[in-house]
Regions:
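Charge-dense, helix-prone N-terminal extensions
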Residues: 1-133
Length: 133
């Protein structure tokens, strides 16, 4: 599942206006913006983050989710879809799809964070103190 240096450089050059950060991950490369992962490079294929808001757009364009082999079975990671065919030849369109992927990654990150509130913290402390006393 390696990524060639040439493909990685090509994608980073296309996405340069968005100032992405790339990090090696296993045998692929993760693409980050503002602390959230919005893309994945695996086997010289670009995958972008989707959510319930953007998934249909990718499916209408004929894209499919990221899949990989794990032993005898195929695993599908439905949060990342392959970039639609021909999009790498349309830099402006690719940037818009990537902006949508960054927005999807942010929405997913914010919904995944546990809600915290001072009253919840106080309640926990009261309960904990009552149990120990």
């Amino acid at each position: 599942m390696a990524v060639s240096r040439g493909f990685q450089d090509f994608i980073l050059d296309l996405l340069r206006p968005l100032d992405p950060v790339s990090r090696r991950m296993f045998s692929g490369v993760g693409l980050f913006h503002g602390g959230v992962m919005f893309g994945l490079l695996v086997r010289d294929i670009l995958y972008l983050r989707v959510d319930e808001t953007t998934r249909e757009q990718f499916e209408r364009a004929g894209s499919s989710p990221f899949t990989y082999q794990r032993g005898e079975r195929e695993v599908s990671l439905s949060a990342y879809y392959v970039v639609p065919e021909g999009l790498l030849d349309q830099p402006d369109a690719l940037l818009q799809w990537t902006r949508n992927a960054i927005a999807a990654a942010r929405r997913s990150a914010s919904s995944a964070r546990p809600a915290t509130s001072r009253s919840g913290v106080r309640q926990y402390r009261r309960t904990r103190n009552a149990d120990s006393g």
